[in-house]
């Protein structure tokens, strides 16, 4: 190779490297998402999201609360909301999670709110997915409303006396997914729904997003939280999905989560 050819090749190589670096710089860096799952559920319910997260360059961490899923053997009447908050804090500590996005789905909004209050310095954003958003001193039964809370407690009395049976799954769930979910969901300790969240630092200063699923089921309790999020000027989104979008609409949910993380 003569000198002119060498210089031309070198220039082309530098240009290609510069273009590659520019492309890489333009792409958002991967994020870590930690999921606080809903009632009766567990980490297994998010299995459709793992490959989608990986393909988008993100990491998804989906632990299971004490007494549910693969931790069923630890179930007891003493399990409460604080137990589940401590579960999540343990994962954050031992997985050494920093600058991560915390997701709370449904009941998981109760857990996520408590977690965000304890370790705000580790969390870059909280995303509530069709979730309860309590204020200090509120329990989930308070947010359900008097009639719904009474039905929950009556159902517990009619059952084993300490657990709440799973609710109906969304009607647009496929037969295959319905069989999968029915086979794995477990009753939830009532005390987790009766324990008020205690916020040591008041309303969080962490950026928050609320995603409201618009395929509304009967007795929808989440419209009030969506309205609050809009009134308080949160980052607000709506998704054409029923209550378990991670099961019934994983790709649209992934697209939205990636967009929120990249903003």
Spans of model-derived segments:
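N-terminal export signals
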Residues: 5-25
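Active-site nucleophile elbow and catalytic-triad environment of alpha/beta-hydrolase enzymes
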Residues: 183-200
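Catalytic active-site module of serine/aspartate enzymes centered on a nucleophile-bearing elbow/loop
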Residues: 237, 241-263
